[in-house]
């Protein structure tokens, strides 16, 4: 009995630490994501180039064979700076995307739980349907906000003076990329591939936090682990693998749509059909090793740091706004 009460107290304490404003949630989520992307940006870079190589060709030579070999090739030709291409765009994008995806998930979930389960405490309800919808909804918000930045980031990271993969577009930086796209392609150009971005991010977000929270609850309820960094690490690892499997096909599609400037693809479904028809179904999992190599540590760091940034922001809000 005392063991059950102890578990309940821990859950209540944890929930209280994350009971912050929507703006605070956005800030905490964005901050956690920026810390993570600093480490994982080089892996994102090689993932993009692996996804683009062999585009619309089943027999093209593979310059980048795996993430480690690929990063070694980039380092040899472009140096450390080359491995961190697009980092500034990645920071701004992460604030928009993950600030929304990580920050708005709990407020949306809580509101829906209050609506559908009025007789229960919202933070104690674990409805798969509500969790998945909340994850997808918060992800879609982030995808819309961050789409122009992801577009510029993709083009910055795919460009290389040494090994040309896919369509090459040279921008001097984030602002130059945004201005150039606006001048040449208009507002529509800035939101090129927004439908693919929504599919990609919605798919990944629909499983990221639901898997994370479900894994934590199962591990704690069955006395397999106690709440703390080890639990957060384990649950986020499981979540990262789930995200990689679900998101990779749409990630390939989005990368290709973002990188092309013409009308090679009419939309995400057209790109999906052409990719499978010409390169085979396995093309949808191009760069999967890099995806796992990136998304697993990125998710681990994002979700683990989010636990801490949520508590940090909550403590600041408590002092400034007088939260209980």
From Swiss-Prot:
Keyword Metal-binding: no
Chief place of localization: mitochondrion
Membrane-spanning ranges: 26-46, 79-99, 132-152, 193-213, 233-253, 284-305
SUPFAM superfamilies hit by this protein: Mitochondrial carrier (SSF103506)
Activity regulation note: Inhibited by alpha-keto isocaproate, an intermediate of leucine biosynthesis pathway.
Signal peptide (from-to): none
GO molecular-function terms, A-Z: isopropylmalate transmembrane transporter activity; malonate(1-) transmembrane transporter activity; oxaloacetate transmembrane transporter activity; sulfate transmembrane transporter activity; transmembrane transporter activity
Disruption phenotype: Auxotrophy due to deficient leucine biosynthesis.
GO cellular component terms attached to this protein's record: mitochondrial inner membrane; mitochondrion
Residue stretches of each Solcar repeat: 20-111, 126-218, 227-312
Role noted for this protein: Antiporter that exchanges dicarboxylates and sulfur oxoanions across the inner membrane of mitochondria. Exports alpha-isopropylmalate from mitochondrial matrix to the cytosol, where it serves as a precursor for leucine biosynthesis.
Extra remark beyond the main annotation: Present with 5350 molecules/cell in log phase SD medium.
Similarity section: Belongs to the mitochondrial carrier (TC 2.A.29) family.
Protein's UniProt name: Mitochondrial oxaloacetate transport protein
Lineage: Eukaryota, Fungi, Dikarya, Ascomycota, Saccharomycotina
